[in-house]
A protein has these predicted regions:
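Mid-to-C-terminal secondary-structure elements
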Residues: 35-218
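Alpha-helical transmembrane segments
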Residues: 1-17
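Residue-level recognition of transmembrane alpha-helices
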Residues: 207, 226-229, 260
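Amphipathic alpha-helical segments that mediate coupling or scaffolding at interfaces
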Residues: 8, 123, 193, 215, ...
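Short extracytoplasmic/periplasmic juxtamembrane "stem" segments immediately C-terminal to an N-terminal membrane anchor
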Residues: 12-28
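N-terminal membrane-entry
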Residues: 217-233
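Hydrophobic transmembrane alpha-helices
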Residues: 231-241
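Intracellular coupling helices
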Residues: 239-271
C-alpha cells in the first residue's frame, strides 16, 4: 500500500499542479469573468489565470459518435472525454503543447476550433492532425493543436482520448497559478479583488493539489490502519519473544541449580 501511495504521489501527471488554486465562478464573476482574470493577473504573485469546466482532478464527461477527416472506420465508436476551457488554460497548468498552437485571443472566436490529447490522435489513427477537422455535436471543428497526455482523473484510471474546446462562458471553475513562497500575500490580494465583485459571497479557494489528494482518501486510511496494525503485530511479536526467553532462562536456572545440588562441576554446567 505504501508503495502504491508513493507511486501516486511521485507520478508525473503531465502538468504542474503545484501552487494552483481554484474556486467557483459565481455571482458577478459569471458575467465579468474576463475582467476578473485580467485584474487577477496584475496582482503580485499571480503568474497566470484561466478557468475550466468542473475540477481538473476529475474530468468525467464522455461522448460518442463523432466523425473526423480521414476516419478509417465508423464501426467501432470511440469514447471521448471532453472539457470546456478558457484561454490560458494550458499555460496556467503548464501542459506541454505537442503540435500546432493553443487557444489564443489573437485569432478571435475559437468556438469552431479544438485541441486533442495524444491518446485521441492515437486511437483516431490520424497522421498530422493539425489543420484537419472533427465533427462534434453536429459542428465541424478545426484541429489547431495537440497536447501531451495528462491525467485528469485518478491514477487508477487509464488516460482516455480527450478533446478540449474554448468556451469561456461555459466554464465554472477559476484557476490561478501562484508564485511559490508568496501564497499568503497573493491569496489575500485575490480575496480582496474577489470581494470587489462578490462582497456577499465567501471567497473559498482551495489548492488543486488537495483535490488530487482527496481522490486517495480511502487508500490513505488503509495505509494508516496498516501502519497501526503492523506496529501492534511487531509489539506482540516482541512480547512473545520476551516471554519465551524469560521462560527459557527460568527453566535453565532451575536446571543449573538442580545439577549443582547433585554435585556437577562448573565445567559440567557449561558443557
Amino acid at each position: 500500500i505504501y508503495l502504491q501511495m508513493d507511486f501516486v504521489q511521485s507520478k508525473n501527471l503531465g502538468f504542474n499542479k503545484a501552487n494552483i488554486i481554484s474556486f467557483e465562478k459565481e455571482g458577478k464573476l459569471v458575467q465579468s469573468l474576463e475582467s476578473f482574470l485580467n485584474e487577477a493577473k496584475t496582482i503580485p504573485g499571480v503568474l497566470d489565470a484561466s478557468s475550466t469546466q468542473g475540477s481538473v482532478a476529475n474530468i468525467s464527461s464522455s461522448s460518442w459518435g463523432h466523425t473526423w477527416e480521414g476516419q478509417v472506420s465508423s464501426e467501432n465508436e470511440i469514447e471521448f472525454s471532453g472539457v470546456t476551457i478558457n484561454y490560458d488554460f494550458f499555460e496556467t497548468l503548464s501542459i506541454p503543447l505537442k503540435e500546432g498552437r493553443t487557444f489564443s485571443r489573437e485569432f478571435g472566436n475559437e468556438e469552431s476550433t479544438i485541441i486533442l490529447n495524444e491518446k485521441a490522435v492515437e486511437v483516431m489513427q490520424m497522421a498530422d492532425p493539425v489543420g484537419k477537422w472533427i465533427n462534434l455535436f453536429g459542428t465541424q471543428r478545426e484541429i489547431i493543436g495537440t497536447v501531451k497526455n495528462f491525467h485528469f482523473q485518478s491514477m487508477y484510471e487509464e488516460i482516455k482520448p480527450m478533446f478540449l474546446m474554448c468556451f469561456p462562458i461555459y466554464t465554472n471553475t477559476v484557476l490561478v497559478k501562484i508564485q511559490s513562497g508568496t501564497e499568503l500575500e497573493t491569496l489575500a490580494g485575490l480575496e480582496k479583488l474577489y470581494k470587489q465583485y462578490n462582497p456577499d459571497i465567501p471567497f473559498e479557494a482551495k489548492f488543486l493539489d488537495d483535490d488530487y489528494q482527496a481522490l486517495y482518501i480511502s487508500e490513505k486510511r488503509i495505509a494508516t490502519l496498516s501502519k497501526y496494525f503492523a506496529t501492534i503485530a511487531i509489539v506482540i511479536s516482541c512480547l512473545g519473544l520476551f516471554c519465551f526467553f524469560s521462560f527459557a532462562a527460568e527453566r535453565r536456572t532451575k536446571e543449573i541449580s538442580i545439577r549443582k545440588v547433585l554435585g556437577a562441576t562448573e565445567g559440567n554446567l557449561i558443557y
